[in-house]
Amino acid sequence: MERYDILRDLGSGNFGVAKLVREKANGEFYAVKYIERGLKIDEHVQREIINHRDLKHPNIIRFKEVFVTPTHLAIVMEYAAGGELFERICNAGRFSEDEGRYYFKQLISGVSYCHAMQICHRDLKLENTLLDGSPSSHLKICDFGYSKSSVLHSQPKSTVGTPAYVAPEVLSRKEYNGKIADVWSCGVTLYVMLVGAYPFEDPEDPRNIRNTIQRILSVHYTIPDYVRISSECKHLLSRIFVADPDKRITVPEIEKHPWFLKGPLVVPPEEEKCDNGVEEEEEEEEKCRQSVEEIVKIIEEARKGVNGTDNNGGLGLIDGSIDLDDIDDADIYDDVDDDEERNGDFVCAL
């Protein structure tokens, strides 16, 4: 940490804590995610770092480097000063159709890039979309802990993600197309932006995970009468929320949908800067970038733990995301204190 000044905490979760830091050499701000050394440095952590390393897109949080401290593995990445999109919806209640489309276009742009890089995210949700804090409020996808690369890994079949956002086929415990499952999660994100509630929660018992899963499997959702959205938007949602993944709309098809094509073009932040030094800066960054071999070596060092001990706190809820294969048909919320935030339920009044 000799190169960084720690400024303040950004948040915490089961993974550990995130801090805002400033690089001493150039004054640049970064976010650093600290994960305790030991068994918490699992396959999800390694996958997150390796997959994230190769992604360079204006709508994806940029990875910088990883290193170890005596007690933690530290992942350094771009700092998004605008916070979570989740928080903005909590404050607004819900977005207008134009505002929802503005963010949805950016989400799809980032997801399309990931898919072109043969990476499916598998845990797309509002809490994993950040805002850069600029006047234009650009969206940034983060947290690749459950992502899977078809280049490095087989077709996904594990049941991972956040319950409210999970596609029906993900619950089947069979192999599925992670890219098409991502489309479903994007649809849930769009619905929440426009409605201010989750599409498949039981309004009578929103914390009942079994009811949510049943409603997902039966594609049971409605758009409340008080929400005014266009027929084109409703049509897009109906093409996303399709139980059969083979019949679900794809990302390229979404990009051609009439509703998606409406509204102004979203200018990427790199184009807004018009900085002649950007290319040189990126070339220099590429020269200094850690290799996969270096990263794996650092991760192996972090797995050793502190003084030969492991720091595994158990795996269940990770920032609201779960591996349902680890839970034997149990109500996952039994393991969470009532006062803790539960993804799958808004914790603020909408």
Swiss-Prot record:
Active site: 123
Pfam families: Pkinase
Protein residues bound to ATP: 10-18, 33
Catalyzed reactions: L-seryl-[protein] + ATP = O-phospho-L-seryl-[protein] + ADP + H(+); L-threonyl-[protein] + ATP = O-phospho-L-threonyl-[protein] + ADP + H(+)
Induction: By abscisic acid (ABA), salt, and osmotic stress (at protein level).
EC number(s) from the headed UniProt entry: 2.7.11.1
Name of the encoding gene: SRK2F
Species annotation: Arabidopsis thaliana
Entry's Gene Ontology BP terms: response to osmotic stress; response to salt stress
Keywords: ATP-binding, Coiled coil, Kinase, Nucleotide-binding, Serine/threonine-protein kinase, Transferase
Alphabetized SUPFAM superfamilies for the sequence: Protein kinase-like (PK-like) (SSF56112)
Official protein name in the record: Serine/threonine-protein kinase SRK2F
Gene3D superfamilies in UniProt: Phosphorylase Kinase, domain 1, Transferase(Phosphotransferase) domain 1
GO terms, molecular function: ATP binding; kinase activity; protein serine kinase activity; protein serine/threonine kinase activity
Entry-linked PROSITE patterns: PROTEIN_KINASE_ATP, PROTEIN_KINASE_DOM, PROTEIN_KINASE_ST
Higher taxonomy: Eukaryota, Viridiplantae, Streptophyta, Embryophyta, Tracheophyta
Coiled-coil residue windows: 270-303
Tissue specificity remark: Expressed in seedlings.
